[in-house]
Amino acid sequence: MPESAEAQVKEALLALLKDRDIQHITMKEIAEKAKVSRGSLYLYYEDKFSIIEDVIEDMKEGLGKALFDAFSHMDTLHLNKKRQTVHPTLSFVHEHRSFFSVMMNRGHFHRFFKDVFQQDVLLAPIHVNLTPIERDIYGHYRALYTYAIILYWLNEDAAASPEAISQKVWELVSQKRFYWLFGKAVPGEREKEKQIDRRVVRTREALQKAFLDVLAEKQDYAGITISDITRKSNIRRATFYDHYANKEELLQTMIQRSCAEIIDHLTIASSPNEFSLKEAEKALAILLSALSNMPIVHFLNREWGVPHVIPDMFKALESFYLHQQTDIHAEKKLYAHYVSAMIIGLLLYRLDEGKAHPPEVLAREFLQFLDVKKYKVVLL
């Protein structure tokens, strides 16, 4: 396929993805949008998924090259001395905005950045020779904070230039501290729960447990029906509708409940800047240990197709951090995005690659990166 036609096909799919999920887009629509014949399209692409995979690989290669070109002449990177430069990732996102605008709000897209950061350039803490586990955790950390920054830019400050966002980013990361992960309780967040009748609580808990059981059996969110849930819970269908309008509302309630539990583990009585590193390690290790018993574990399984989980987690965590009284001079909403991404990234790492490591090790290794301000540039 000529390069111009290939570019048209990719742009056509991205344009269609602005309004619909890829599951609801046909090859016929892509061909019509790109102004190519279906026959020509099928000569080069087996299906629509092979097109989006091709687009993603192009973007990974492009971003990797941009990072390599930006850092290959450097030995070190000091966050306090980069205020007048444009972040190379942000320049690339600006150049390919149509792709990132479509993809950023999709579940698990942070892995795009993790793949890129493992390919060409590694920014390692200046005085540390990273072990394999530290390198893996750090790659996840760097991927998530990049994801959070771009998410903030596209969703909260879309009119800003890459130069303006870069200045905000350097301002933020030059101040970063491990205790940013923690905060004080937000008044009134749990008052409604305390007032609910115990019988109502028991019924809802039974429905939620049944939903989890059915999800584990079917391993497909789309295939779950209200009848499945009521049969499993032995609760009448009419009773289900007394509590939830549909399975989506039930799911939202359970995600919010899990997020509240996560936030409980991050809530401390003292001011965060008085929290010691040892106390932070202990609190984070307890959260990682408790994670396996939370419903959110099932919802984060990519194979089961549960929608909106990561965006909903972002909203809950962002709200918690926005309510904190901080002495941070950077943009507060950017700070909330950044720290929320840190937590979500760590939890995702724990559920995937981090299963083999003790929670205490993950907590310790993760927290040490949050205070690093100076990095050595390692070409891979």
Curated annotation (Swiss-Prot):
<feature type="domain" description="HTH tetR-type 1">
    <location>
        <begin position="3"/>
        <end position="63"/>
    </location>
</feature>
<dbReference type="InterPro" id="IPR001647">
    <property type="entry name" value="HTH_TetR"/>
</dbReference>
<protein>
    <recommendedName>
        <fullName>Uncharacterized HTH-type transcriptional regulator YxbF</fullName>
    </recommendedName>
</protein>
<keyword id="KW-0804">Transcription</keyword>
<dbReference type="GO" id="GO:0003677">
    <property type="term" value="F:DNA binding"/>
</dbReference>
<keyword id="KW-0805">Transcription regulation</keyword>
<dbReference type="InterPro" id="IPR050624">
    <property type="entry name" value="HTH-type_Tx_Regulator"/>
</dbReference>
<keyword id="KW-0677">Repeat</keyword>
<feature type="domain" description="HTH tetR-type 2">
    <location>
        <begin position="201"/>
        <end position="262"/>
    </location>
</feature>
<feature type="DNA-binding region" description="H-T-H motif">
    <location>
        <begin position="225"/>
        <end position="244"/>
    </location>
</feature>
<keyword id="KW-0238">DNA-binding</keyword>
<keyword id="KW-0678">Repressor</keyword>
<dbReference type="Pfam" id="PF00440">
    <property type="entry name" value="TetR_N"/>
</dbReference>
<dbReference type="GO" id="GO:0032993">
    <property type="term" value="C:protein-DNA complex"/>
</dbReference>
<dbReference type="InterPro" id="IPR009057">
    <property type="entry name" value="Homeodomain-like_sf"/>
</dbReference>
<dbReference type="GO" id="GO:0003700">
    <property type="term" value="F:DNA-binding transcription factor activity"/>
</dbReference>
